[in-house]
């Protein structure tokens, strides 16, 4: 999903779940100098986020949404929500960033709170405030709802975004419906906001939904998942979103020799030898040698 090959200075970069390792974020920002970045949740910084990212705060604007693991421990919670850049949380609002209106929905759907496949009236609690009021004082955490449910999506969070007006980009921790563990509610939110792009984390996969055949080019928005330690740069270099962006020409030639007209389909199909990624995504990240060996083996009669 990375676009380093097409554009030296992207406007926006989206980073998949760091889970405490922010070195890839720092390195990419220092190399590519985007105008702004968005962390897609499960940050779990080992120190306050402004300290972990201190070397890049003068180089780019840092924004984030939270993930479900950002409420796992007191340390996870405080290092994010207690940091000096806690006001850069995009959850539940739309902010203009690097020339784009970016909407954010952090956290996950927990069906004990709200199953978005069911009517909102059936939610256990419509808002975190409603949940707090229903709790006994001794059940509260820091006089509010439990720490765990501070990363749960409540109907009120969702509806606030629905009423927020138009946006260009929607960033979420949860995936859209085309993902096997995705949610139609994400698609409905994206379409209501009129976004052109949805970017999510959570599932530790680099996914170009159109290139991998999960969505059609006629879909109302483009969608990408970003893996842990990976990133997506935006805008992409090629206006048509070609599936072959960033792949060395010799790999394209090898694929054509091995598969003929089916070459592109093979390049865009997830493969177990590539940790479930597509050869396209794997090669675009700079890991083209393994794909090259696979194609060579196929040409010589091997089964891959």
Locations of regions flagged by a protein language model:
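N-terminal active-site segment of His-dependent metallophosphoesterases
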Residues: 1-58, 72, 163-166
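Acidic, histidine-bearing metal-coordination/catalytic regions of metal-dependent phosphoesterases
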Residues: 1-23, 98, 106-109, 121-127, ...
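Binuclear metal-dependent phosphoesterase catalytic core
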Residues: 2, 6-9, 24-27, 95-98, ...
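Active-site neighborhood of phospho(di)ester-bond hydrolases with catalytic His/Asp-centered motifs
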Residues: 14-16, 37-42, 62-69, 89-91, ...
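Active-site environment of divalent metal-dependent phosphoester hydrolases
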Residues: 19-25, 44-49, 68-76, 110-114, ...
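A basic- and aromatic-enriched beta-loop-alpha substructure that forms the phosphate/nucleotide-
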Residues: 61-120
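Active-site-proximal loop/helix segment associated with metal-binding centers of metalloenzymes
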Residues: 100-174
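Non-transmembrane "mature" sequence context
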Residues: 242-304
């Amino acid at each position: 999903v990375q676009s380093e090959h097409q554009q030296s200075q992207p406007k926006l970069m989206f980073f998949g779940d760091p889970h405490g390792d922010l070195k890839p974020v720092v390195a990419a920002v220092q190399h590519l100098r985007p105008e702004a970045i968005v962390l897609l949740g499960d940050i779990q910084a080992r120190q306050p986020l402004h300290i972990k990212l201190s070397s890049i705060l003068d180089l780019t604007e840092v924004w984030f949404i939270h993930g479900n693991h950002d409420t796992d421990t007191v340390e996870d919670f405080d290092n994010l929500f207690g940091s000096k850049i806690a006001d850069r949380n995009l959850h539940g609002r739309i902010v203009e960033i690097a020339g784009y209106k970016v909407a954010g929905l952090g956290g996950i759907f927990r069906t004990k709170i709200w199953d978005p496949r069911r009517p909102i009236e059936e939610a256990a609690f419509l808002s975190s405030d409603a949940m707090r009021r229903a709790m006994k004082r001794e059940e509260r955490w820091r006089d509010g709802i439990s720490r765990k449910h501070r990363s749960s999506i409540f109907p009120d969070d969702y509806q606030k975004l629905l009423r927020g007006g138009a946006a260009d980009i929607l960033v979420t921790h949860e995936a859209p419906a085309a993902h096997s563990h995705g949610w139609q509610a994400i698609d409905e939110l994206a379409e209501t906001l009129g976004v052109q792009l949805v970017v999510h984390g959570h599932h530790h996969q680099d996914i170009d939904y159109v290139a991998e055949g999960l969505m059609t080019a006629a879909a109302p928005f483009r969608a990408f998942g970003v893996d842990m330690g990976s990133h997506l740069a935006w805008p992409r270099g090629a206006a048509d979103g070609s599936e072959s962006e960033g792949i060395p020409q010799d790999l394209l030639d090898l694929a054509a020799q091995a598969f003929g007209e089916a070459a592109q389909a093979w390049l865009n199909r997830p493969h177990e030898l590539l940790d479930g990624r597509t050869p396209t995504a794997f090669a675009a990240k700079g890991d083209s040698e393994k794909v090259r060996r696979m194609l060579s083996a196929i040409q010589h009669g091997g089964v891959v």
